[in-house]
Design a protein with these regions (language model features):
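Sec-dependent bacterial lipoprotein signal peptides
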Residues: 1-19
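Cystatin/cathelin-like cysteine-protease inhibitor module
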Residues: 19-128
Length: 128
């Protein structure tokens, strides 16, 4: 009986931690987009995927994503990233959101955002 109670308590604590990280990742992405989208677009968030770790992204891929995303017309060109936040394992989340320009034209975008393990910095993002 004690084992079952221990396992249930541990599962509950892990679930709460996971929910907290998911919320933190969503907030980080929203803050990042609010800072780095051009001001002539209104952004509304549709959905987010689950937060997932990956060890498949290296510094060259990060640099390539940053360069590619800086060419998009709705993204500011002078995004400041923290290179010290790039570690062997990153966390990623996919976000789908709608941009509405001044004329009312909507564009739905899905992008993947890569973050450090502490969920303090977006280190890169890419178009899906």
């Amino acid at each position: 009986m004690k084992k079952i109670l221990y396992v249930l308590t541990l599962s509950f604590v892990l679930a709460l931690t996971s929910c907290g990280d998911q919320y933190k990742a969503k907030s980080l992405v929203k803050d990042f987009l609010n800072e780095n989208l051009t001001t002539d677009n209104d952004c509304s968030y549709e959905r987010f995927s689950n937060l997932t770790p990956t060890a498949m992204i290296d510094i060259d891929q990060v640099k390539s994503m940053r360069k590619e995303m800086s060419t998009l017309p709705y993204v500011k060109k002078d995004i400041s990233y923290n290179d010290n936040a790039i570690t062997d394992t990153l966390l990623y989340i996919r976000a789908t959101y709608k941009l509405t320009d001044k004329e009312g034209k909507q564009q739905e975008l899905t992008q993947t955002f890569y973050m450090d393990k502490a969920l303090t910095h977006v280190v890169a993002f890419k178009q899906n």
